A protein has these predicted regions:
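Conserved catalytic core of the tyrosine transesterase superfamily
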Residues: 1-167
Length: 167
């Protein structure tokens, strides 16, 4: 479950609230899409069901998910089984795997699930994706909202630098 959840957020930028509310009916396996209404904006969004994300979901559903009757994909693994909520356990999940990977963060309260959205946006900038594509991936209607997520890399800043004429 953890792997599938982390991968979906890292690769697709889905907000944790939308991830917790993801239902089987949101997955269009035939067209390889994930379609849902965002909780924060109430806008419909359609994201590609990337192969690695799809396989992680299949593995979780077939091998890790408790066999319970609920439309929600992600559920708790301790009785009483229910849909996963938006509590702070997600930040603990990220920190747990950071510790296992011997990764450290200067600011531990900024290494939760939401930081994976920031990382995705930064990676898309580094890959020179169009700003409009980044906004669409993050589910933003306004590019102003997307600007908050972008941390421009040093190499990209060097590309913008002007030559200094000799004096």
């Amino acid at each position: 479950r953890d792997y599938a959840m982390l991968l979906i957020v890292a690769r697709l930028g889905i907000r944790i609230g939308d991830l917790c509310n993801l239902k089987f009916s949101n997955i269009d396996w035939s067209n390889q899409r994930i379609d849902f209404v965002q909780g924060k904006t109430q806008h419909r969004i359609s994201l590609p069901l990337l192969k690695d994300v799809g396989w992680a979901l299949i593995d979780y559903i077939q091998n890790g998910r408790p066999k319970i009757d609920t439309p929600y994909i992600f559920v708790t693994h301790v009785a009483p089984f229910k849909e996963f909520d938006q509590g702070n356990r997600h930040s603990r999940m990220v920190r747990k795997y950071m510790n296992l990977a011997h990764l450290t963060s200067v600011n531990t309260h900024k290494c939760g699930m939401h930081s994976l959205r920031h990382t995705l946006a930064s990676t898309m900038v580094e890959n020179r994706e169009k700003f409009s594509n980044i906004s669409a991936t993050l589910g933003h209607r306004s590019e102003d909202s997307t600007a908050i997520y972008l941390k421009t890399g040093v190499e990209l800043l060097r590309d913008c630098a002007l030559e200094i004429p000799e004096v």
